[in-house]
């Protein structure tokens, strides 16, 4: 007979595994192909290419999480970022494959390669609102909603966002 404690343990383990199970199959498309397949991410893709990050990061071994702004969101970003500013772009990329469930399990915090933190500050479980923060500080500056999460690639995951995160 199963005890209540055993049922909770099994349920918790199942939820944990579900958050980790969203991995692209071996040989699936790489991040740049996933980003390139969505015409609504073409401006972001062009900036990754012009900055050199597309080849520097995504054409080499490594797993990444990308917060990819839509073309509309990208058009509202500062010109330096739209033109391929590496620091601004690195603030949209994190190391590791972080599904939405993984982000939520980490308390809604992600450290980006550019050194900023991104935190969940509201929204819903399916479409959280995120905001940038300088390390050790409260979130500030622009925020964005994740409008399509967990787009898996062989070398990471893409979350499509309606904004470009810039801490103030």
What would you call each of these model-derived segments?
Residues 2, 8, 20-168:
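Mature, structured domains of secreted/extracytosolic soluble proteins
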Residues 11-12:
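Sec-dependent signal peptide hydrophobic core
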